[in-house]
Structures are given as structure tokens and as C-alpha cells.
Amino acid sequence: MQYNPLGKTDLRVSRLCLGCMTFGEPDRGNHAWTLPEESSRPIIKRALEGGINFFDTANSYSDGSSEEIVGRALRDFARREDVVVATKVFHRVGDLPEGLSRAQILRSIDDSLRRLGMDYVDILQIHRWDYNTPIEETLEALNDVVKAGKARYIGASSMHASQFAQALELQKQHGWAQFVSMQDHYNLIYREEEREMLPLCYQEGVAVIPWSPLARGRLTRPWGETTARLVSDEVGKNLYKESDENDAQIAERLTGVSEELGATRAQVALAWLLSKPGIAAPIIGTSREEQLDELLNAVDITLKPEQIAELETPYKPHPVVGFK
């Protein structure tokens, strides 16, 4: 596994981040496809054995049970100082309503730390932009979380570049803790972030940790092939309902490049992301250890410029999605 600094921080993270949305009690929350604790723990352990030290979860994943499962596994399988743990705040959890008010942020971080069984998280991220709370209130509360030692750094996710630029400027003006990472929706068939967000992050030294790097499984198999997970994944249906013949052509070229390299589609799709400047660690999700082993090998693949061009050429602009 390769490791890089996360933006301007002193955190060194693996080139792949393990997304923990998959881990959670199926009877909690709104995703019936999640893995219960006994099925989640072996995957987390295998990730650690494979060199992954970066784990991303959220307060809302499976109504908090993702944080509980991840926290217990990391306590059992790793030393706290050897892992980088990121969580998020915004969505409703139990009786905590959706939002980023000061009260919501301060309660949420305490609840997350309790569920994780940790004294601090390395990164507390705002999951979405809150249109009902003044951004100054949100940013000052996040700064207070850092000052209290409950989060080492703060990050953001899924917003317009103009909003992110506004937040960064306010943080500079007030001397508040600045966002060090942006978790955005970015993959071979959704590249709208290349227009404004990625250049902004590169300019500001903000690390990019893309979510859905494999388009929720669509870049791992022949185009149009379905699975039980794809059928039941309402989020994925909303994200990729505008997919068209250009996306199918990209998927076809992905198959060709992967065959040329003797690699899998998923490995090449991740290698493409890792070739982009400013990309710290794509967030991978997996439900089986053998899938994880496959993805771990992506860090060893280097694409040639002509292969990158082959994959990128068919892309056409898409409607902006992923901010809700």
C-alpha cells in the first residue's frame, strides 16, 4: 500500500479509503443491504492487513450502527494512533434532526465519539450544505469542535464549488479551522466536479476523497448487467438515471483497457482516479473480502496517457447530482 499526506495536514493516509456505509445492522436505518457486525469485522480486519489505514463513516449510516461496528473493530484490530477515522454530520439520526446548527454539530460529535468508543476523530465532515443554518454558525461550531480536541481536522462533502469557496474564505477571515478535505462524487461516468470543484481544491491544497468511485458497482461489470444490490439501491438509481450511450461506451472501453492490462474493470477505474492530481484516496466500499483484495491491487496499476485518453474521450456532460 502507498501512503500520502492528506492535503495540508500531518495525516498520512493510504491511497484507498475504506467506506463504511456497507457496515451496519440491516434492521437499522434505510439500507437493507448492509452487513451486520459479524460479517463486517472480517472485512475491516482484512483492510487493515492490506495496508488501509483510512476509514470513512457517518453518524447517519445505519442509524449510527456503522460507527459502533467500525469503532469496536478498530479497537480490537488496530492501535488508535495508527488509523485515520473520518465521520460526518448533517443527516437525521434518531431524535437528532437533520442540519448543521451549532447545537446539532456539538451533540452529533459527542454521539459519534460515544458510538465509536473514541476520544476524537481525525476528520469531522459536513455531509451536505445546510440551507437552513447560517454558514457562519456552522463554521464557528466546527472550529469549536477542533479547539475542544474532539476532531483533529474538518472536511466537507457534496456541495457547489461556489459554496465551498465561500466557506473557505470565511474560515480565513475569522481564523477558524479550515476544511482540509472534500468528499465529492467523481468517477469515470460522472466528471462534473472537474469543472470547478477540483480546480478549487487543487488551488487551496484541499485533499479530494471521491465517493462512488465505481459508480455504485456500474463500473465493475458489463454495462447493463444487474445485481440484487443494484436493483435495491435507490440512491444509485437516482445518481445514474441519466446514464446514456456515452456511459455505455466508456464502460466498453474500460473493459478493453482492463483486458489489455490483465486487470479488472474496478482496478482500472480506480487507477484512473488515482492518476488525477489532488486525489488523495478514493473511498471504496465492499461486501466481501475477495472484492477488497481485488481493489487493493489498483494502487499498483499505472495507466499510460493513451489509455487515460481512451477512457475519457466518450464522456459528455451530465446533470449535476449528489448534493441531496
From Swiss-Prot:
EC numbers, comma separated: 1.1.-.-
Pfam families per record: Aldo_ket_red
A molecular function (GO) term: oxidoreductase activity
GO cellular component terms, A-Z: cytosol
One BP term from GO: thiamine metabolic process
Keyword DNA damage appears in the UniProt entry: no
SUPFAM superfamilies, A to Z: NAD(P)-linked oxidoreductase (SSF51430)
Catalytic activity: D-ribulose 5-phosphate + AH2 = 1-deoxy-D-xylulose 5-phosphate + A + H2O
Regulation: NADH, NADPH or ATP do not increase activity.
The keyword Oxidoreductase belongs to this UniProt entry's keyword annotation: yes
Enzyme class: oxidoreductase
InterPro entries, A to Z: AKR, AKR_Detox_Biosynth, NADP_OxRdtase_dom, NADP_OxRdtase_dom_sf
Active site: Y61 (proton donor)
Task performed by this protein: Catalyzes the conversion of ribulose 5-phosphate (Ru5P) to 1-deoxy-D-xylulose 5-phosphate (DXP), providing a direct route from pentoses to terpenes. May play a role in biosynthesis of DXP under conditions of thiamine starvation.
Additional information: Overexpression supports cell viability in the absence of the essential dxs-encoded 1-deoxy-D-xylulose-5-phosphate synthase. Overexpression confers resistance to the 4-amino-2-methyl 5-hydroxymethylpyrimidine (HMP) analogs bacimethrin and 4-amino-2-trifluoromethyl 5-hydroxymethylpyrimidine (CF(3)-HMP).
Protein name as it appears in the record: 1-deoxyxylulose-5-phosphate synthase YajO
